[in-house]
């Protein structure tokens, strides 16, 4: 069986922060991996001072620049001897715009992804269902129902992906129907976050970074996790991909921590956690799947 994995993310950098190790691991194992990004991240803040004027209320060129960052990040995640993973944008680059955080003026933009007409014939659900029918992935990954940390575009990506998985398996759309075998949410486990933050006590971080209370970082109870993917063998590729998103984040010299523009340290996880929400789990002796394709071959 040719293994095919589709990951749906809201903005450039989300693919690396939450699932970069998983992408790199499955590419190294020869799986067909596709990352669909729903917006260009136009409303992001900028960490790198030379590019600070690219933001939405100035030059409004950040989205185009982030295409280049995403391209470099996906190349970094790719197997050196294999094909280079390329970006794919839902509806094409620029079809939908970053909606910004809840309550900001960006939410009122006519192209804001969070308020897109999802049931339109050319809306995000139909377009993503078309991609699913085209690629025929056994496994699809997106966010949980709160989008990980509450960003409207992450919540919309969750809603759109869930509906698209249903639509791809049903009648009424062009193309041959396809039933996704397993749908996962990308999450972090509370234990992972607690251990990662505790390790900062012995980690040299940049002087202007702050160490958070572990409980302030979003995570799910460990008991809710259904899969843990070991990505230690490709950790260097994940770190390189994080560094490619230089307008959005910085990686500590040690490579085990990163910070967004708020300069709050977060651990670079070398196990990536998931919750299976559709399909049949095939856990190992510890009660967890160690392969997203477990039970399918």
UniProtKB/Swiss-Prot annotation:
InterPro entries: GlcNAc_PI_deacetylase-related, LmbE-like_dom_sf, Mycothiol_biosynthesis_MshB
Zinc found in the keyword field: yes
Example GO molecular function: N-acetylglucosaminylinositol deacetylase activity
Highest rank taxon of the organism: Bacteria
EC number: 3.5.1.103
Record's cofactor remark: Binds 1 zinc ion per subunit.
Catalysed conversion reaction: 1D-myo-inositol 2-acetamido-2-deoxy-alpha-D-glucopyranoside + H2O = 1D-myo-inositol 2-amino-2-deoxy-alpha-D-glucopyranoside + acetate
BP GO annotations: mycothiol biosynthetic process
Cofactor(s) required, per the database record: Zn(2+)
Keyword annotations: Hydrolase, Metal-binding, Zinc
Family named by the database record: Belongs to the MshB deacetylase family.
Function in brief: Catalyzes the deacetylation of 1D-myo-inositol 2-acetamido-2-deoxy-alpha-D-glucopyranoside (GlcNAc-Ins) in the mycothiol biosynthesis pathway.
Listed name of the protein: 1D-myo-inositol 2-acetamido-2-deoxy-alpha-D-glucopyranoside deacetylase
Gene: mshB
């Amino acid at each position: 069986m040719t293994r095919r994995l589709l990951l749906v993310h809201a903005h450039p950098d989300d693919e690396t922060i939450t699932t970069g190790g998983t992408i790199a691991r499955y590419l190294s194992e020869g799986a067909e991996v596709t990352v669909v990004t729903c917006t260009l991240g136009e409303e992001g803040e900028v960490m790198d001072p030379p590019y600070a004027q690219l933001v939405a209320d100035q030059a409004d060129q950040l989205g185009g620049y982030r295409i280049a960052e995403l391209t470099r990040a996906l190349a970094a995640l790719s197997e050196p001897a294999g094909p280079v993973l390329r970006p794919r944008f839902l509806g094409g680059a620029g079809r939908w715009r970053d909606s910004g955080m809840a309550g900001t003026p960006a939410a009122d933009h006519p192209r804001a992804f969070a308020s897109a007409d999802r049931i339109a014939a050319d809306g995000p659900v139909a377009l993503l269902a078309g991609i699913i029918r085209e690629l025929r992935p056994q496994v699809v990954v997106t966010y949980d129902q709160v989008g990980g940390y509450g960003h409207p575009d992450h919540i919309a990506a969750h809603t759109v992906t869930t509906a698209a998985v249903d639509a791809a398996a049903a009648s009424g759309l062009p193309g041959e129907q396809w039933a996704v075998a397993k749908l996962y949410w990308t999450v972090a486990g509370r234990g992972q976050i607690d251990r990662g933050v505790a390790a900062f006590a012995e980690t040299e971080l940049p002087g202007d970074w702050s160490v958070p209370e572990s409980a302030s970082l979003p995570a799910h109870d460990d008991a809710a996790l259904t899969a843990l993917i070991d990505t230690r063998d490709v950790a260097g590729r994940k770190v390189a991909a994080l560094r490619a998103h230089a307008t959005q984040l910085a990686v500590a010299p040690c490579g085990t921590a990163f910070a967004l523009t708020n300069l709050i340290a977060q651990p670079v996880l070398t196990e990536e956690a998931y919750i299976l929400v559709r399909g049949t789990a095939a856990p190992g002796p510890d009660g967890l799947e160690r392969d997203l394709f477990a039970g399918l071959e």
